[in-house]
Amino acid sequence: MENKNRLVLLDILRAIGVMLMIEGHTIDAVMSPIYKDGSSILFQFWTFFRGLTAPFFFFSAGFAFVIATVKDKGEVLTVPARAMKRRLRRIIVLLLIGYGLHMPLQMFYDPSAVPQSAWDIFFIADALQIISLSLLVILLIALFTKKKENLLKSYIIAASLSLIIAPLTEPIKWETYLPHLVYPYLTFRAGSFFTFFPFSGYLFAGAAFSAAALSFPANDRARLLSKNFKRASMVSLILFVLFFPIQLLFVSPYVDYWRALPAVNFLRFGLVTSIAALVGYLSLQVTRFPKILPAIGKSSLTIYVVHLMIVYGSPVNIGLAQLLPGGVHPIVAVLIAVVVMTLMFGMVYAIEVYRSRRRRLAAIIIGDVTK
């Protein structure tokens, strides 16, 4: 039951992230600009909570990566060779998909015809690129750290530095020192939606909680994880209260305030861990959850890619954003988001049915062969 609870906790966090992602992307893409009023409290509230999507995804990705990769051999931690190869393959796939979603179609038949603006979009750092690079760092730390306490400390230090250091790294003119392929990972000025600092911090934080879980007794892991989530949320919210007035005095608003500055990221991390604690305690009380939840977790990458193609289009198709260039009323946008979400969950259900039937067929074939 313990292992089941722990997995359910992670599955629910992923499901929350998926729902926030689909809702946020769809409404943002199809809602008319005239309703995106920055002076509206309701719009500001929606915008802020939309900003929790990436932290949920990144945090759960870091947590799941360490749980699936690092094996506890008593006093020593190991990364099995097979697991390392699979994780490296996963990292490369994430990176290729991330760039593939922004690839100019002309690149396939006439690269010289690709305008500079299209190349700029191709090179921006998006969620999958940041996840892949962060997971590579997480893997390297795990490979060179053999003790549980050292692994935990390493991830905590990495998370803290990443969340705090962004105000120092953002003003640097990386474009004058680094190639076009690299500097978008370090500055929002390149048009990147996410940068390594501070967003890798959420993955490192997830990895830290996962590393801590390696030391917990198996029969009490979910409860102790939930307790740690609660403590982390309280510390993060206190840091938000402390950092917010300080950075107003000493940090100039040089860039998108809601993405780069530490206080806001402490607030977001505090909310993510608060929800994680609530989900953790809930998983200890509820014995059965809908089977669709773990399926959503397993198919989160597929959902990410397919829903982006539906909403924003891709090099091979047009999306809702192109079909509705003028946008729609917010209520209509919400209804469209519900439809897209329903389609994605229907796709997940179909995938699970296919996998189940394939396994059943394989079992029948193997049984017949061995008779």
Residue ranges and their predicted role:
Residues 1-371:
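Alpha-helical transmembrane segments and their immediate juxtamembrane cytosolic regions
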